[in-house]
Amino acid sequence: MSSLKRSSSAIKGSNEYRSSKSGRKQLRTIRKASGPRRGLAEESANEENNGSETEAEDKLAAPELNEPAQDQRAGGEAYAALLTLLKAEHGGPARRKTKTDDKKTSADPTSNVKDEEESESRDNEDEEEDEDEEAAIENALMDEHTSGDEDDEGDDGSHQDDINGVTREGGDATELAAGFEEEDKPDTLEIHFNSVSEKDTNALDAAFKAKEVRYRSCKLHVDKNQEFIYSRPTLVNEPASAVSAPDGSQSLNSYFIKQRLKIQNDLLDSQDKLTPLQKQIVDPMFQYQDLLYEYEDYDKETEYRDLYALHVLNHIYKTRDRILKNNQRLQENPDQELLDQGFTRPKVLIVAPTRDAAYDILSKIIQKSGLDQVDKKAKFKDQFFQEALPPSYKPKSFQQLFKGNTNDFFVLGAKFTRKTIKLYSNFYQSDIIICSPLGIQLILENTDKKKRQDDFLSSIELLVVDQLHSIEFQNMLHLTSIFEHINKIPQQQHDADFSRIKMWYINDQAKLFRQTLIFTKFSSPFANSLINGKCRNYAGRWKNHRVIFPENSSLGQLGMRTRLIFQRFDLVGKSVSEEPDSRFKHFCSVIVPNIVKSTGYEDGILLYIPDYTDFVRVRNYLREKTTILFGDINEYSEQRQLTSNRAMFQQGRVKVLLYTERLHHFRRYEIKGVKTVIFYKPPTNPEFFEEVARYLGKSAFLGLADLNISVVRCLFSKLDGLSLERIVGTERAAVLTHGPNETYEFK
């Protein structure tokens, strides 16, 4: 298999698919007998019968809230039987072993015990506000039967007249005609999700599970400042061949975009209105390939958010309209096989670091949607928007990250109907879920195992991680947890219509089709681990690499002359996992003796440590194995300790001050009395290198230090190439990491 072959008839044309029709008919019969479908698939039917039928459905649904345990067990067994039947009839892979609870998953998975580390990092959290947030999440996770779609039935009266995404109330014939013309364009959603043969999908899935996938890559040079790397998964037994990047037009005109979105966003003419950044990412985004994009400046966030907001809406509208069309087709011919759904309704998950970022993202989506009615918009603004600004003397990056509402605890659902956006919707009835890593962690990894729930993430087709560089300073494990829980086969049925679920959902292959978009200011090993290790999109992935010239590096922007020493320790014959141990040994054997017998200043030594585990290790060593007088300040220190230790360091009463990167990220202290700086590891953010090194300049200005004697020393290994590149420049970083010398000095 040279590659995954896309064919418009690949699925329906296979004998395996034909053989599954009898099973699908049985499932449709079972499904109809089990109760009403209450979700997107019935919206078009509900619009005509929003009176007496609603009451009848409510009467049918109500008993399910208090069904006995025996019925729940029977339901769970029936759900497992449905999955087994589908796979057996379809000739799919063996049934995936999943745990089915004897009892229905709890409807309110909230945590009564707050993680102490998380609460300490949220300095301004109020306990009553936390309780309100937990209650809101509790309500949003109530089983879908209790928060059905009664409110949808009255405002979706234009379904049949709006099958092409153009509202025809008081209709405009030209808009209708344009809507039909748009369908002549290639639909990348249809191509990506519905045109890959099941044989190829199964082969790639088996290769991933056996760890026999090989990625083949190629580079595209955009200009002298940037290049893109495209990688595609291939099977080990495929013949070696050069990989070429997918064709792209760098224009929205090449893609099928719903007509109402084109009208709302002024995209009807053929004029290209994309910015240079948007032209770089429009093709990977709209062709449903994965993307890790490192942007240059915070001002660029608006540009990529504008584009993915349009992409998200286009995906939701097209997916939803296809289901509504198929509802009508099934009414005309119930024997048709129309596979257009997942297990649950949510299709888009957006992860953001703060409420301010979430407010900006969701506001863009609302503005671009073309819908005027937004339920609970005032509540959304009240809870997510603030006009607060950080002090003007703080660095620009700090002001950008910590403006507005910096609360990092939230999960919010948004549901789209024909005329209305419903915020704070039930998660199982939402189209978009926007969350912080901490907020969704409360649901996915609840301390009470009975309250854990991840079924609402089972059918996510588009995952967006925004401002990853900021999320990395919260808790990376929370973000990793999302990737572990997404696209799993749900443990409960949730009224899924199995006769319409796509087979790659049934076969637990949704991860091969999910698109992941990651945006960050600074690429990092963690970012690479996500795109390389957690994303399995069969369509491949893109990463950009920015070339840093010396004048644009941290050294070029430092603005003062002092000794800058970069000291490398080697990892010959050692694995990546042994790097922290090698760094610590080098620190103990080389750096500590220099501190004890310093030829420069004996005090005023600031030791900057990016990783908290390294900080604890170094602190314990200095405390137990040396007689060095030192103090330490970190992100978990109380305010009294922060003030006291900084004052003693400034007065020279302690010789060394240990300072963590997370504390600097959240506070940006101006530490006084610094005469020597030691970086235990290169900072993740190059701005931090400049800010900390400039402490020496301030001491020199106050007459406390001489820049000819002061030193900035940085430990690094060849694994620190990404961080070094932004500090010294791309070419210099290559010399430092692979050159013959172990020590390099700049001045």
From Swiss-Prot:
Residue ranges, compositional bias (Basic residues): 21-35
BP GO terms, sorted: maturation of SSU-rRNA from tricistronic rRNA transcript (SSU-rRNA, 5.8S rRNA, LSU-rRNA)
Protein name (record): U3 small nucleolar RNA-associated protein 25
Any GO molecular function: U3 snoRNA binding
Region (Disordered): 1-170
Keywords, alphabetical: Nucleus, Ribonucleoprotein, Ribosome biogenesis, rRNA processing
Subcellular location, record wording: Nucleus, Nucleolus
Biased composition (Polar residues): 1-12
PANTHER family recorded: ORF PROTEIN-RELATED (PTHR12933), U3 SMALL NUCLEOLAR RNA-ASSOCIATED PROTEIN 25 HOMOLOG (PTHR12933:SF0)
Highest rank taxon of the organism: Eukaryota
Physiological role: DEAD-box RNA helicase-like protein required for pre-18S rRNA processing, specifically at sites A0, A1, and A2.
Annotated InterPro entries: P-loop_NTPase, UTP25, UTP25_C, UTP25_NTPase-like
Keyword Glycoprotein carried by entry: no
Main location class: nucleus
GO (cellular component) term, any one: small-subunit processome
Stretches with biased composition (Acidic residues): 115-136
Family that this chain belongs to: Belongs to the UTP25 family.
Subunit structure as annotated in this protein's UniProt entry: Component of the ribosomal small subunit (SSU) processome composed of at least 40 protein subunits and snoRNA U3.
